[in-house]
């Protein structure tokens, strides 16, 4: 039983995991009445279930503190990796959002000024 699990894990790690970079979920949701802010944390009232990872997304960390999404629509793009990455494009503002219990700031890019922050967690 234990050997079988190790074999499955090695097959998964060496053959399946490299293909996790593909686009997994694209969801467009309206934000006029379905988002709550708590500091810089945004809680989405949706569950994007990743079948391969078996982990529903319930909380994402919003990096930009000047993000105004009321009445806007968010294009939520989820790619599967060891740390999930969410790319949000809202009205010209492009932000990378870390997803999970300990989100990682990948980068934050404003179209007005080409500043970015990377490597913070």
From Swiss-Prot:
It is found in: Membrane. Keywords: Membrane, Transmembrane, Transmembrane helix. The chain crosses the membrane at residues 11-31. GO terms for cellular component: membrane. The keyword Transmembrane applies. It is a single-pass membrane protein. This is Putative uncharacterized protein C1347.14c. It comes from Schizosaccharomyces pombe (strain 972 / ATCC 24843) (Fission yeast).
